[in-house]
């Protein structure tokens, strides 16, 4: 029986563990946090005690279901999304989302989904090393040195090592040190974010089946996203620059009060006061893109998820691509009958292209959402109208393909570019 060591037991690592265990691998998962089935405190935001809401689109949903997790249990971790709302001048412009298949995106409770993955990993016989950190990775020896709360180091020997340990991956750092010509790029956005949580989303006018976006009328100052989370609260991510005023470093109460009054004026005064209180009290979080020149080392070590391609959340695809990574990886193992020397290089070949395309689109979406652009809404309607009239000539709505299909990201990027060309032609005409 082959032994797989997975460093990182989050969403990507957990799903990969289930896939491999069901294929007969002996799976060992090293996770620095505690067991979410016993205590979720280390899996949620330390300050707000709530996880940031995330959106699971069709590619993520299909990847989870392919691992044998029942759809009903996955659906119980979130709410189906039927529309997006864009706030401009205090008014919402709604955009209905029409599914192309029998799936709708889910506004997901990350902590509940994590518990679901751990439940099925346990049922599949996965062994976890909770509250253990990875100290060292032997790339050629296929072993990892770990340390638990007792301070005693322990070496785990395997037949493969999977790095699913996030944007600051210890496995990727070992590859950086051990591989010649390994290229790594970490790009910080000029914005960061803080997550604010308000109780009783329904009373505040937020629908649980809708994603809300802010900042379209801010002239590039900020971007925001809000979604109802399963406990009935609304989670609002406020993205601001680190410099200037207002910014994430602003501590002047009148300045930030004016900001919330300007862009969230539709909320009651007590809600805006609570947003102000949380904003001034909470630390900020960075937004980064991580790119690696390769996702593997020989047939020994593989990176997936954020360890390979951490992405700022402006396309809503970071988690979805990570889950698709897990599915793609095991499908390659199946295709090559477990031959890691063939499957690992092909994984890099296939997924590197997709990761780069996804990150480029996320950056482009960030620029759109944080810039004043009233044409944005007309363009979306124009695209749908033109495709309905000339389906063989005019490309479909890229957003619908993104949310409702598993179309490869490089193909979606081509659609986006074609739309740009045709839209410019349409404007000239």
From Swiss-Prot:
GO terms for biological process: antibiotic biosynthetic process; kynurenine metabolic process. The keyword NADP applies. One of its GO terms (molecular function) is FAD binding. The keyword Chaperone does not apply. It catalyses: protoviolaceinate + NADPH + O2 + H(+) = violaceinate + NADP(+) + H2O; protoviolaceinate + NADH + O2 + H(+) = violaceinate + NAD(+) + H2O; protodeoxyviolaceinate + NADPH + O2 + H(+) = deoxyviolaceinate + NADP(+) + H2O; protodeoxyviolaceinate + NADH + O2 + H(+) = deoxyviolaceinate + NAD(+) + H2O. Induction: By N-acylhomoserine lactone (AHL). FAD binds at residues 3-21. It is an enzyme of class 1 (oxidoreductase). SUPFAM superfamilies: alpha/beta-Hydrolases, FAD/NAD(P)-binding domain. Its EC number is 1.14.13.224. Coiled coil: none annotated. Violacein production is used as a biosensor for the detection of quorum-sensing AHL production. Violacein possesses antibacterial, antiviral, antimicrobial, antileishmanial, trypanocidal and potential antitumoral activities. Pathway: Pigment biosynthesis; violacein biosynthesis. Catalyzes the hydroxylation of the 16-position of protoviolaceinate and protodeoxyviolaceinate to form violacein and deoxyviolacein, respectively. This is Violacein synthase. The gene is vioC.
């Amino acid at each position: 029986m082959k032994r797989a060591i997975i460093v990182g037991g989050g969403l990507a690592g957990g799903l990969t563990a289930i896939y491999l265990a069901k294929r007969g691998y002996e799976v060992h998962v090293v996770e620095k946090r505690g067991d979410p089935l016993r205590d979720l405190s280390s899996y949620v935001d330390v300050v707000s005690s709530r996880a940031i809401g995330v959106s699971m689109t069709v590619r993520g949903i299909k990847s989870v279901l392919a691992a044998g997790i029942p759809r009903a249990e996955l659906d119980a971790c979130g709410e189906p999304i039927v529309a997006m709302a864009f706030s401009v001048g205090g008014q919402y412009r709604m955009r209905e989302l029409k599914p192309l298949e029998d799936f709708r995106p889910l506004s997901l409770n990350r902590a509940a989904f994590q518990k679901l993955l751990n439940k099925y990993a346990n049922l599949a016989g996965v062994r976890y090393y909770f509250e253990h950190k990875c100290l060292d990775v032997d790339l050629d020896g296929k072993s990892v040195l770990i340390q638990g709360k007792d301070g005693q180091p322990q070496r785990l020997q395997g037949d493969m090592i999977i790095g699913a340990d996030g944007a600051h991956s210890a496995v990727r750092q070992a590859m950086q040190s051990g591989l010649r010509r390994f290229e790594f790029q970490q790009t910080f956005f000029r914005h960061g974010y803080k997550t604010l949580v308000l109780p009783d989303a329904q009373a505040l006018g937020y629908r649980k089946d809708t994603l809300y976006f802010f900042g379209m009328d801010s002239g590039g100052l900020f971007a925001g996203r809000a979604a109802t989370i399963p406990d009935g609260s609304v989670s609002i991510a406020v993205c601001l620059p680190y410099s200037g005023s207002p910014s994430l470093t602003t501590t002047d109460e009148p300045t930030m009060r004016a900001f919330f009054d300007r862009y969230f004026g539709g909320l009651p005064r007590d809600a805006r006061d609570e947003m102000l209180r949380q904003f001034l009290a909470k630390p900020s979080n960075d937004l980064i893109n991580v790119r690696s020149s390769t996702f593997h080392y020989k047939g020994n070590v593989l990176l997936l998820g954020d360890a390979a391609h951490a992405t700022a959340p402006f396309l809503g695809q970071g988690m979805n691509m990570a889950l698709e990574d897990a599915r793609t990886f095991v499908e390659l193992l199946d295709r090559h009958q477990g031959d890691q020397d063939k499957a690992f290089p092909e994984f890099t070949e296939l997924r590197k292209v997709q990761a780069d395309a996804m990150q480029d689109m996320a950056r482009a979406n960030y620029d759109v959402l944080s810039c004043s652009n009233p044409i944005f809404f007309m363009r979306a309607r124009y695209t749908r109208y033109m495709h309905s009239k000339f389906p063989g000539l005019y490309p479909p709505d890229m957003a619908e393909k993104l949310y409702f299909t598993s179309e490869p990201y490089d193909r979606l990027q081509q659609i986006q570019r074609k739309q740009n060309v045709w839209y410019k032609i349409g404007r000239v005409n």
